[in-house]
Amino acid sequence: MAHKKGGGSSKNGRDSNSQRLGVKRFGGESVLAGNILVRQRGTKFRPGNNVGLGKDHTLFALVTGKVKFEMVTKLKMQVSVYPE
């Protein structure tokens, strides 16, 4: 017979790593070509002038310049980069 009761195992105690999504460069900031502007799931922000869209929907600058966030419609926002 067991001298002590079996220690129960907890079913909690796990968590996933954060995905670190969100805006990385804000409006008016200067960026270099290739800088990541927004990390997102789906196209919450759409690519505008001089902005590329990665396969995971990441927006990145195609040219060096200043970031501008623009409303396309009431619901859609696009991110553009204008050369200085």
UniProtKB/Swiss-Prot annotation:
Region feature Disordered, mapped onto this chain:
1-24
* Pfam families referenced in this protein's UniProt entry, alphabetically: Ribosomal_L27
Q: Which GO terms describe its molecular function?
A: structural constituent of ribosome
Q: Which domain of life is it from?
A: Bacteria
Task: Give any single GO term for biological process.
Answer: translation
Q: Which cellular component appears as one GO term in the record?
A: cytosolic large ribosomal subunit
Keyword annotations for this protein?
A: Ribonucleoprotein, Ribosomal protein
Record flagged with keyword Ribosomal protein:
yes
Gene3D superfamilies reported in the protein's UniProt record: 2.40.50.100
In terms of NCBIfam families, this protein maps to: L27
- Family of this protein: Belongs to the bacterial ribosomal protein bL27 family.
* Protein name, per record: Large ribosomal subunit protein bL27
Give the species this sequence originates from. Answer: Leptospira interrogans serogroup Icterohaemorrhagiae serovar Lai (strain 56601)
The gene is rpmA
